[in-house]
């Protein structure tokens, strides 16, 4: 049974997750405060094997280079998010008005249907674009990490370059909402929820939602 640890990091309060199984672990969305993340990993005596970004907006990847250097593990993304990663500095300057370091280099790519083994835990990669072209969700036994696709009573924004509302709604309804209702959702920001709760009451994509796919 996996343990999922949450570390809230950075100015946008990103949820960085440490998914641990039998001391092996993957680090998901190390968006800032890398030394704190590594210290936590070492404190729980986990042995990380990958860094994974659910997508490559700056608040999910700023800590990657330092975490990778300290732990000597590869960084994985979906290939369709590579252009967004490579233009991270100019996009942050344009939309946020401040400077960030150069983007991290990518060591490998994930695609829909891939599986990541973390000891005896199998994590399934779901391509869930809409918030960004290469957004992925990571689904395991009774849980899914959704990045900025699906939140507690909300969905990811789609007004940034590469975002598309209809695509996001389709990803949520046709991929995430196919999971069991009691699946725990670990989003990129904010508190946990469940698939069942969001299917019922999410104001954007739930049963009474006002948004429809065109």
Could you tell me what each predicted segment is?
Residues 2-44, 137-146:
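Conserved beta-strand hairpin/beta-sheet module of binuclear metal-dependent hydrolase folds
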Residues 7-8, 106-107, 127-129:
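Short Gly/Pro-enriched turn/cap motifs at secondary-structure boundaries
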Residues 25, 91-92, 115, 121-214:
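Metallo-beta-lactamase
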Residues 28-30, 53, 77, 120, ...:
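Small/polar loops that bind or transfer phosphate-bearing groups
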Residues 5, 15-17, 108, 113-114, ...:
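Residue-level detector of beta-strand structural context in well-folded domains
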Residues 19, 54, 128:
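Conserved S/T- and glycine-rich ATP-binding loop of Class I adenylate-forming
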């Amino acid at each position: 049974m996996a343990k999922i640890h949450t570390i809230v990091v950075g100015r946008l309060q990103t949820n960085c997750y440490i998914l641990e199984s039998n001391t092996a672990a993957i680090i998901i969305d190390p968006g800032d405060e890398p030394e704190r993340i590594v210290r936590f990993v070492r404190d729980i005596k986990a042995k990380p094997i990958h860094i994974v970004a659910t997508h490559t907006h700056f608040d999910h990847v700023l800590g990657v280079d330092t975490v990778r250097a300290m732990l000597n593990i590869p960084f994985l993304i979906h290939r369709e998010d590579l252009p967004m990663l490579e233009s991270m500095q100019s996009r942050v300057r344009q939309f946020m008005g401040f400077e960030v370091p150069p983007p991290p280099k990518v060591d490998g790519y994930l695609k829909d249907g891939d599986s990541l083994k973390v000891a005896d835990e199998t994590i399934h990669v779901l391509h869930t674009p809409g918030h960004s072209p290469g957004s992925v969700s990571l689904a395991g036994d009774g849980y899914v990490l959704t990045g900025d696709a699906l939140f507690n009573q909300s969905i990811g924004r789609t007004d940034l370059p590469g975002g598309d509302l209809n695509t996001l709604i389709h990803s949520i309804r046709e991929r995430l909402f196919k999971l069991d209702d009691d699946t725990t959702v670990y989003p990129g920001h904010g508190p946990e929820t469940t698939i069942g709760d969001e299917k019922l009451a999410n104001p954007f994509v739930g049963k009474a939602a006002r948004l429809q796919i065109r």
